Amino acid sequence: YQLVLDRRIGEYRLPDGWSIIAAGNREKDKAVTHRMPSALANRMVHLEFDVSPDDWILWAQQAGIRREVIAFLRFRPKLLHDFDPLSSGKAFASPRSWAFLSGILDANPDPDVEYELFRGTVGDGAAAEFMGFLRVWRELPSVEDILANPADALVPDDPAALYAVCEALSEKAADGTVNALVTYAGRLPSEFGVL
């Protein structure tokens, strides 16, 4: 209680203006929690947060998360966090596990074990959907081809492929590519032209 009540730890005192923030798991999530003593709990404000796909994507773009992971989660935002505390499965989709999956992709795993690695990271359902998306992603026209020939480059029909192309192109937005991007975006279905 010393930190919360006295704003100090031993001889160290927190500077004026500093706030104390504690984070933890909810008991209902069955994620190694311990009940907080009521006297301590009564000295805090308790808030629950939902995962925001938009906020996570903003973070992911700056944190070096793979483009295909970001594109997939734009396409299927409900899979960013898919936790069921009653499930017996060990792996489940969460912001942390998607970041970990991005690291697996960085390691360029053998295609024969790739799906198993994904299953063991984000769970069965999310891994299956991601693998389907990844197959489409890997068959897309290259960004270089689109920028070189925006009026004639392939425009995919599949929504997953369109999300993937838009994500890849967003990484190339710069003064020298604006005209090509606008030309290509004008050929996309209207709901994708603004991505």
Listing of model-derived features with the role each one plays in the protein:
Residues 1-195:
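C-terminal regulatory/interaction module of P-loop NTP-utilizing enzymes
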